Design a protein with these regions (language model features):
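Negatively charged, low-complexity tracts enriched in Asp/Glu with abundant Ser/Thr
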Residues: 1-22, 61-79
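Acidic, low-complexity, intrinsically disordered interaction modules
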Residues: 26-74
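Short acidic DE-rich linear segments
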Residues: 83-86
Length: 86
């Protein structure tokens, strides 16, 4: 992981917290689905417009910061959803 750009540090840190917790994000723009999964938790599943919005926001982040890999953007954008498990 490269954290050289201070403007993207917050996203790298969020992705690291998510990975350290065993959380994964699986997106499929072709089927308009997003699944956020963690060990011992019920999956958070989005489809249709909700999934499309999530995927679009991840793409915007990725386009704005080209050094940010898409998987890091997805993990960072998914972090607020994990509050549903609290």
């Amino acid at each position: 992981m490269s954290k050289s750009n201070p403007r993207t540090r917050i996203f790298w840190d969020a992705a690291k917290r998510m990975r350290d917790a065993g959380i994964t994000v699986d997106t499929d723009s072709g089927y308009s689905t997003v699944s956020i999964d963690a060990p011992g938790q019920e999956s958070i599943f989005m489809q249709g417009d909700e999934a499309d919005s999530f995927i679009e926001e991840c793409r915007k982040l990725w386009i704005r910061y080209p050094s940010l890999p898409m998987d890091v953007a997805e993990l960072a954008m998914a972090e607020p959803y994990t509050d549903l498990w609290s």
